Amino acid sequence: MTPLAIRGRIFVVGVPRSGTTLLQGLLATHSTTTSFTESHFFARHFSRLPGTSTAILTRNPAPGVAAFLNENGEEPVDASRWFSSENRPWLRLKPWLPTQSRTVARRLLRIFDELALRRGTPYWIEKTPRHLRYVPYLERVSNEDPRPQFIHMIRDGMEVVASLYRASQSWERPYDLETCIQRWNEDVAFSLTRVADPNDHFVFYEQLTSQPEPTLRRLLADLGLAWEPEILESYGPTTDRLVTEDEPWKADVGRPIRHSATSHRELNAAQRNRVTRLLRQDLYHEIASRAQQRAGGIAAPG
């Protein structure tokens, strides 16, 4: 019997509150995939170098690795044991960290590989929205088969801003409205730069919630995975396992798929006017148009 090998490394990225958890849960219900709670491995431990596709290690990831394993109910794997203070005392020496950036990044990816193999699946899905800006770096450090695939979740800006603004009020550092607008503008502008890359795929929240089966069929085909109708029936419990008790704003993600548009309730008229004025909604239409062209003319969201 041929040993099980990793055939797919899949990252779901995008602006928070764009539907990334919904998509993650759907994909993780496939019989050949597994997924985890948000790792934050790169966003919390690496710093991007402005104007480059490079990032450097700036924080010891060992505590984050241990917390991630505990959150997912997993015992250590070989790749995670590598981070122990006995094996790598230099991880506690901040000046040394940047020199080991590539080595550590690859070891972190290997943790996902080994967990997936332990679970008996050849594909894994990692979903941390903030990893969007680390896509170029993840490409660089993953210079081996299988090449990583990146799924960008795109949602109407007004709805994202309203949802992000509301959800962040329970965070330690809530966002003001301008921060939410800036986050959407900058992140969607970044996703737009990736439209031509063959390893990047684009899913629109409006299409996923109104036409879940054809949208998922196309995405799975692009990822090299067969369609499984059970996904739409069984994704709820899978999604629930990917949400921690510290994420109450995700509590309803595993419910039946429906389009959610709540900006008219979450924001007052003055706030909606401010969002309309500052939001670069043209980015949404541009990325939808270019994704449609790349997909061979499949209708873009309205």
Predicted regions: what they are:
Residues 38-127, 131, 256-257, 261:
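PAPS-dependent sulfation machinery
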